[in-house]
């Protein structure tokens, strides 16, 4: 019995109690999905639910009486061995061995779909992440967002949402001018501007621009700078896109900031806010009443010289997303943008939307790279920062992605290069991938020994403690995925996989899938092969959500 099947049985029990007049509830008050969770203490059963506590007030009954009505009906369900009422009205459900073991076949038959919602939510989410300026390679912070953002997109899709991955291409503003001046100086063998960009990549980009335009340095200096601005940004952005693709991250939309200003989108956004009464004029400038919506002060949107302020682009971009039909706009920002959150939320509210619903902002903390216990602060190519390429070159894509996504974005993380290249159980990505490789090896050995799944499946035989614990872990996967999407926390999937891998390794040590020399193949072996293959499937599904490969050999 799967958690979804138990949830449905609980709902049926509640519905039957309402129909019999034993439970005074509007049928609409019976939850469409009754939440079941693993008890912290396994002595309290396989699954627990607090649904009786949730419905008691509406039903006008003590929670334990509501629980008793459910208990009586649930005990009639095939596969339910015991239902106990605990504390104020919790229901603890114990399944019989066959019902619990049936999950192994359910997982294998579902295949890649196991853990994914079968019902689309209808929700359209715009997930914007990385959005690094095209003035240099992606640094470690952007690399973390690439790993977390892409994994979150995969998790949200698995939970039933439609997700658009979007990269905001910052090709408008002062940083682009500084980049152009840096390229110009490098091409002319001049010192870099005081506020410019350094690193070997600037030399590479400048040389590439000159190769495409051999007579460029013969032009007037202003024309040179404009060419370096245009061509340098394109070359840098092409390099960024290539790095992301090699990292396994593909965006659906690359949105150019400059288009907001050239298309009139900024003016339209300001006018919409004016029509809503959110705009006023003062000191020769145009202001947005953000202080009415929680910001510490009002913000200038059009400066006194007539030029748009920085926030004007944010206004136009947010409105553009909403007009494209997105219900939720999820934005990932680095810790240095923390102070920017109140004005963004105020902007959302000024348009008549709901902050935290139509606009969500996730703030990520710092990433530190360690080698031999010492922080790595310099890149071979970028000069002052460590880049995505540096990390991938050191440990590979799988280890880089996994290590960046396995911790909550709320916390700073230290990436130990020595640990991530170690083939040992204290290396988390190796530990999980090795579990998958072990399941693959078990399947190969089973085939060689004549153990075939299709010959038998008797879940009542899965009674060993390590088998029960492994089945319990497998059953949790759909809820882990759903919760990770709901909370925007893909690290939950990684931590779950580590727990699952641990339980599989214990099962592997305790339970033989193939008979010893001279022994006959039994239904125990065949049924354990189902459990092995179910574990293999869930490990692959979970690693896939993180953008990490599931190797058959290590």
From Swiss-Prot:
One of its GO terms (molecular function) is ATP binding. It catalyses: tRNA(Arg) + L-arginine + ATP = L-arginyl-tRNA(Arg) + AMP + diphosphate. SMART domains: Arg_tRNA_synt_N, DALR_1. GO terms for cellular component: cytoplasm. Keywords: Aminoacyl-tRNA synthetase, ATP-binding, Cytoplasm, Ligase, Nucleotide-binding, Protein biosynthesis. Its EC number is 6.1.1.19. It comes from the Bacteria. Belongs to the class-I aminoacyl-tRNA synthetase family. This is Arginine--tRNA ligase. It comes from Kineococcus radiotolerans (strain ATCC BAA-149 / DSM 14245 / SRS30216).
């Amino acid at each position: 019995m799967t958690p979804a099947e138990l949830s449905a049985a609980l709902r049926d029990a509640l519905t039957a109690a309402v129909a019999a007049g034993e439970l005074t509830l509007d049928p609409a008050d019976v939850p469409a999905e009754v939440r079941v969770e693993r008890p912290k203490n396994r002595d309290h059963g396989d699954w627990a639910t607090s649904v009786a506590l949730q419905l008691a007030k509406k039903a006008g009954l003590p929670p334990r009486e509501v629980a008793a009505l459910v208990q009586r009906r649930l005990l009639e369900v095939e596969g339910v061995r015991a239902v106990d009422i605990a504390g104020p009205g919790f229901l603890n459900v114990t399944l019989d061995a066959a019902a619990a073991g049936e999950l192994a076949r359910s997982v294998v038959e579902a295949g890649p779909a196991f853990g994914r919602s079968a019902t689309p939510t209808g929700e359209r989410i715009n997930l914007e992440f990385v959005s690094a300026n095209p003035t240099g390679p992606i640094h470690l912070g952007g690399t973390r967002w690439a790993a977390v953002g892409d994994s979150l997109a995969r998790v949200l899709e698995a939970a039933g949402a439609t997700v658009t991955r979007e990269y905001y291409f910052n090709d408008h503003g002062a940083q682009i001018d500084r980049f152009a001046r840096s390229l110009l100086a490098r091409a002319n063998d001049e010192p870099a501007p005081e506020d410019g960009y350094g690193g070997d990549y600037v030399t590479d980009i400048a040389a590439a621009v000159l190769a495409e335009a051999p007579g460029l340095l013969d032009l007037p200096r202003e024309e040179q700078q404009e060419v370096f601005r245009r061509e340098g940004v394109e070359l840098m952005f092409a390099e960024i896109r290539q790095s992301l693709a090699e990292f396994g991250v593909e965006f659906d939309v690359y949105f150019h900031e400059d288009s907001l200003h050239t298309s009139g989108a900024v003016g339209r956004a300001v006018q919409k806010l004016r029509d809503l009464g959110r705009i006023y004029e003062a000191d020769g400038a145009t202001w947005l009443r953000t202080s009415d919506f929680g910001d510490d002060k009002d913000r200038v949107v059009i400066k006194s010289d007539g030029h748009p302020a920085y926030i004007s682009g944010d206004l136009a971009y947010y409105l553009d997303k909403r007009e494209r039909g997105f219900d939720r706009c999820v934005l990932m920002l680095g810790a240095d943008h923390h102070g920017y959150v109140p004005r963004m939320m105020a902007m959302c509210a000024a348009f008549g939307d709901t902050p935290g619903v139509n606009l969500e902002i996730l703030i990520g903390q710092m990433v530190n790279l360690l080698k031999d216990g010492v922080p790595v602060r310099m890149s071979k190519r970028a000069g002052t920062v460590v880049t995505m390429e540096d990390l991938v070159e050191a440990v590979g894509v799988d280890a880089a992605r996994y290590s960046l996504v396995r911790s909550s974005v709320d916390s700073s993380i230290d990436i130990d290069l020595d640990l991530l290249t170690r083939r040992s159980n204290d290396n988390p990505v190796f530990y999980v991938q090795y579990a998958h490789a072990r399941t693959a090896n078990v399947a190969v050995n089973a085939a060689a020994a004549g153990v075939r799944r299709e010959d038998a499946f008797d879940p009542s035989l899965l009674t060993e403690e390590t088998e029960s614990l492994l089945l319990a872990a497998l059953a949790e996967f759909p809820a882990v995925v759903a919760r990770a999407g709901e909370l925007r926390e893909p690290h939950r999937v990684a931590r779950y996989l580590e727990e699952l891998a641990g339980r599989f390794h214990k099962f592997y040590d305790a339970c033989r899938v193939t008979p010893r020399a001279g022994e006959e193949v039994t239904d125990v072996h065949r049924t354990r092969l189902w459990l092995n293959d179910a574990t293999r499937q869930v490990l692959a599904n979970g690693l896939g959500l993180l953008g990490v490969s599931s190797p058959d050999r290590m």
